[in-house]
Amino acid sequence: MPSNARAGNLKDPEVAELFFKDDPEKLFADLREIGHGSFGAVYFARDIRNNEVVAIKKMSYSGKQSNEKWQDIIKEVKFLQKLRHPNTIEYKGCYLREHTAWLVMEYCLGSASDLLEVHKKPLQEMEIAAITHGALQGLAYLHNHNMIHRDVKAGNILLTEPGLVKLGDFGSASIMAPANSFVGTPYWMAPEVILAMDEGQYDGKVDVWSLGITSIELAERKPPLFNMNAMSALYHIAQNESPVLQSNHWSEYFRNFVDSCLQKIPQDRPTSDMLLKHRFLQRERPQTVIMELIQRTKDAVRELDNLQYRKMKKILFQDTQNGPNTETTEEEEEAEQFLHCTGTITSMESSQSVPSMSISASSQSSSVNSLADASDDSGEMAMMQEGEHTVTSNSSVIHRLPAHDNIYDDPYQPEMEAQQSSSAARRRAYCRNRDHFATIRTASLVTRQIQEHEQDSALREQMSGYKRMRRQHQKQLMALENKLKSELDEHQQRLDKELEAHRSNFSAENEKISKKHQAIFEKEAKGGMTEEKKFQQHILGQQKKELTNLLESQKRQYKIRKEQLKEELQENQSTPKREKQEWLLRQKESMQHYQAEEEANLLRRQRQYFELQCRQYKRKMLLARHNLDQDLLREELNKKQTQRDLECAMLLRQHECTQELEFRHLQLLQHTRSELIRMQHQTELGNQLEYNKRREQELRQKHAAEVRQQPKSLKSKELQIKRQFQDTCKIQTRQYKALRNHLLETTPKSEHKSILKRLKDEQTRKLAILAEQYDHSINEMLSTQALRLDETQEAEYQELRIQLQKELELLNAYQSKIKIHTDAQHERELKELEQRVSIRRALLEQRIEEEMLALQTERSERIRSLLERQAREIEAFDSESMRLGFSNMALTGIPAEAFNQGYQAPPPGWPSRPVPRSGSHWSHGVQNTGAPQLWRQPTLLAPPSASWGLHPPGSSSSLSALPSSSSSSSSSPSSSSGGRPGLLLLRNSPQPLRRGGSGGPSEAGLSRSTSVTSQLSNGSHLSYS
């Protein structure tokens, strides 16, 4: 049935055949509610067709989560229909009426937990073995049919009148094994069920764990950790060691049986079939063990109910003159004597029990509480008013007939004393059908169960909400995994279509590339000629500007130097005027001669530089044409391998795309899982904090009640002290009178007056002392009682705080463990995916390498012939340059004149047409380093190392040093830069054209002859546009 079907919809034939069409209200009579649970209510009923007593479990599927409730009903009905075994509850049918399912099952006396509730003591080892053996046989039947119960506990192990043990409450069962849902009752859950969503699936061995916990429950009256919050118990079970039997009086067989069931690792835990052969179950025991236990329990229940009934009867009809305290005390003594006679325990349970929260009524029936308390009286009165005693255990029913026998006369009928004959007739009718309503539960137990169900609705709703959240998280993860899988399949289909479409476009692309190449070749040729002219004009303009700047600079320097010389002559007054003029004339001639020589040198260097740059430019153009030829050949060769190259590149790209999608899917899945775990942890923490708050509030309410009750207690103690002092005063008064009479009798009458006065003073003094003692006793009692109450309440509060803090720390440790496990799982999944992707990538690269090697031989031969031809052309050009006077170094390196020459850099938009169009080209085999790229580099010109000779006549400096320095600098680039702190950079010099593809060592080599795999491994392919 689809999970999204409307609740109660019977249009699906498979669902409709699960339910009978009859009206259940017409088939079953005498319905009486005998239990209540989170699923609904359990009723006793009688089938009017055959007078058979049955149990009816009513489950509503309206309101909140109606679809989920409906699915749970369908699942339970399907499960019960499959059961055919003596140790499982018998299913009789299911009916629908007004959004409520009536699940009819066989009637049982009660559950194993009822035995503990009635007797208030653990079962004997022989009885535990018998009950466990029967339950294990039922579990073995389920497990052999790939079914899991998932809620095994004493409250779900039922007993019948013939002494059979049956499994009940299959609302949590799973038809398929393994399973991965978070279901069950917390205290009995196996660790793998608690960690179901985090670690994966589990099988029927979870029932073996629950059976081990149930064995401890039968041996110790409650399961381990039962005094702990249910949520805290989950965290404790998940991360701590397995529980063991506390007492040492149990046999070694029993202890070994429990230890075997509670193996923490599921693989180490035996199966149900293996456990059936355990020595603990195979030991000899009487066949009537369970029968005797049931009979003993029924007798105890009957007598306890009689005592409770007589107690209520006397309370209602006691005479006014008789004090109620006396009657109550007598009844309590009578009950106590009976319990001692039957071997039961009458002490009240001091520990507060927390009912386990399952979807069945047995979850509440397994809580450990006292037999009779004051809160049960009102419930029992109401039940007796209805004329019945009702009990329940899980989906089976345990009943009490209407109280019409000799001990259940209706206390609310005043005329009952006068109607003995009618009562006797009812008692005889009841006794005839007594066996149909036998039970092993007391009325007070049923009442308390209903009260606990109402009081603990918050806890039950919290746990059910937590289970519902865990199931929703699992469904969400499964839906996400299915969605990602379908998305990956669609992605693969889309890639296949893309590859086919790309292959069909290869022929059209080849034709377009050929036409585009021809247009580029023509454009390169025209552009090269235009740029050569612009290049020459640019150099000439820069040289002219440099010459003008030099002439203007010489004029300025000449004037400055002339003024300096005149000042020097004026300072030297001792020199004759004629000598001064001759010396001045010589300085002027020397300066003019130096400037003329400097101008001639500049013109010579400019001419050399211009010729060299033009020759270099032509060589660059030749290299650019060679590169273009290489592009032509490359295009021609690529016509044969373009399809293969692009196909391989596309395969690699598709591989990368698929890899990226897989990693993204894994990241999304892990992020979703982490987010769900974070939400789960927040919910767990919120539940724990809410539980802590509720416990503290309950303690505060208890303390407030104690504080309110304290004045009454203090008043009673004060009255007690007052009575003690009154008695003391009376004694002293009697003693005073006796002493007075004695003295008056033994002394003369004349001394009587003085004696009376002395006795009166003595009496007054003693009474004053007694009054002081009374006041002191009262004050001491008040202060002691107040201090004792404060200390007691503070101790209780601190004890509660410590307990709650431990539970919170347990939760934090559990959540940390889950987070560490999740992170490790995510890391493991990531490594596995990386390994799969790496293997797939290696296989793809191997195939591409084999395909590319087949084309490489032909390609290498064509390239070799082209490179030989281009090398011959370069050699011829270089030979012509040598004939014209240009060295090979001058054409391929930085010219010597460039170190003394400064030109302005061309504008930013200056094109460099000789630059090859492609980024990678073949080398010619001719070494060609080329000039460095200097046009676009801002440079600085170092200041001249020689001054203009501003020294007076007779100094060691002379102007002749300047031209020699300049000359040496122009003749050797290395000498010009060797004596300076750093390499002399050029300022305003035109940048030589950058080298072509064959221009230097950095570009040497064959781009297509390099490893094809190294280029394709990065997911790239060559661009031929």
Swiss-Prot record:
Annotated Polar residues bias: 1007-1025
EC number: 2.7.11.1
Residue ranges that the Swiss-Prot or TrEMBL entry lists as coiled coil: 457-650, 755-876
UniProt enzyme class: transferase
Higher taxonomy: Eukaryota, Metazoa, Chordata, Craniata, Vertebrata
CDD domains membership: STKc_TAO2 (cd06634)
Transferase recorded as keyword: yes
CC cofactor: Mg(2+)
Keywords associated with the record: ATP-binding, Coiled coil, Kinase, Magnesium, Nucleotide-binding, Serine/threonine-protein kinase, Transferase
Catalytic activity: L-seryl-[protein] + ATP = O-phospho-L-seryl-[protein] + ADP + H(+); L-threonyl-[protein] + ATP = O-phospho-L-threonyl-[protein] + ADP + H(+)
SUPFAM superfamilies: Protein kinase-like (PK-like)
Boundaries of every Protein kinase domain copy: 28-281
Single GO BP term: positive regulation of stress-activated MAPK cascade
Active site: 151
Example of a GO cellular component annotation carried by this entry: cytoplasm
InterPro entries from the UniProt entry: Kinase-like_dom_sf, Prot_kinase_dom, Protein_kinase_ATP_BS, Ser/Thr_kinase_AS, TAO_STE20_kinase
Segments for region (Disordered): 349-377, 899-930, 945-1025
Function: Serine/threonine-protein kinase involved in different processes such as apoptotic morphological changes, MAPK8/JNK and MAPK14/p38 MAPK signaling pathway. Activates the JNK MAP kinase pathway.
Any one GO molecular function term: protein serine kinase activity
Positions with a binding annotation for ATP: 34-42, 57
Ranges of biased composition (kind: Pro residues): 905-914
Full protein name: Serine/threonine-protein kinase TAO2
Biased composition (Low complexity): 349-373, 947-986
Pfam family, one: Pkinase
